[in-house]
A protein has these predicted regions:
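Active-site neighborhood of HAD-like aspartate-dependent phosphohydrolases
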Residues: 1-42
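Asp-based, Mg2+/Mn2+-dependent phosphohydrolase catalytic module
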Residues: 1-3, 97-100, 113-219
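Conserved SAM-binding loop
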Residues: 13, 88, 106-109, 141, ...
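Hydrophobic alpha-helical core bundles mediating ligand binding, dimerization, or RNAP-core interactions
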Residues: 24, 28, 48-55, 69-80, ...
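Alpha-helical substrate-recognition element adjacent to the catalytic core
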Residues: 27-59, 65
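Short helix-capping segments at alpha-helix termini
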Residues: 30-33, 59-63, 102, 125-129, ...
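Metal-dependent phosphoesterase signature
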Residues: 34, 56-97, 102
Length: 219
């Protein structure tokens, strides 16, 4: 029986991916480069180190990826400081509140950093529901490695078989599946690959669509 629900953050709870993409495009343009949607899709859900490898392969070995990341984060900071909004994905806040009312433990397993994770959850008014928050600051091996989910289960005192995962990215879903958890996928930018399609428990268009399956999800 499921006792804990673990959510990804970017692209699953919050509609941050489109903002990150705009910030990457601005940062790349400053360097005379074009950051394509295809390249961004390849970087979604993976670690900064792995993303840097892809970016360097795309632009060439001399491309200053560290500066690109620094400028991207600077643009993101500016967006927030100027009052830019971080919107929930459809049904996300309601899903967190629903599972909390059902008496389940709620946790976050994100590839983002702790500072941003706590900021978004706080601003969104849902941090109070979370019993555990695990980010890239807490693990050595990023998604698609299952470490972030295994660490989260340990924090919750739950067996992996008792955990229900919601993810949007291929890397994140692969991590949840590889951890041995019941993993549901709600794609935003990139559709699931064959591994995720074959091993995901459910695939939804939106978190608004999960309720008819609730008995099956929590069994």
């Amino acid at each position: 029986m499921i006792t804990s629900v673990i959510f990804d953050m970017d692209g699953l709870l919050f509609n941050t991916e489109v903002i990150y993409f705009e910030c990457y495009k601005k940062a790349a343009k400053e360097k005379g480069a074009e950051f394509s949607e295809e390249l961004f899709e390849s970087c979604v859900g993976i670690s900064q180190t792995d993303a840097a490898r892809l970016i360097r392969h795309h632009f060439g070995p001399q491309f200053d990826v560290s500066n690109l990341h620094a400028r991207t984060y600077a643009h993101f900071e500016t967006y927030l400081s100027e009052g830019g909004k971080i919107e929930f994905r459809p049904g996300a806040k309601e899903a967190v509140e629903f599972f909390h009312r059902r008496g389940l433990k709620i946790a976050l397993a994100s590839s983002n950093i702790t500072r941003w994770a706590e900021h978004f959850l706080t601003v969104g008014g849902i941090k109070k529901y979370f019993s555990a928050i695990t980010t890239s600051n807490d693990v050595s091996n990023p998604k698609p490695d299952p470490e972030v989910y295994l660490v989260t289960a340990q924090k919750l005192g739950a067996d992996v078989s008792q955990c229900l995962v919601f993810e949007d990215s291929v890397a994140g879903a692969t991590a949840g599946i590889s951890a041995g958890m019941r993993t549901c996928v709600v794609p935003q930018i990139k559709q699931p690959d064959s591994f995720v399609r074959n091993h995901a428990f459910k695939i939804y268009k939106s978190l608004q669509d999960i309720y008819p399956d609730m008995d099956e999800l929590l069994a």
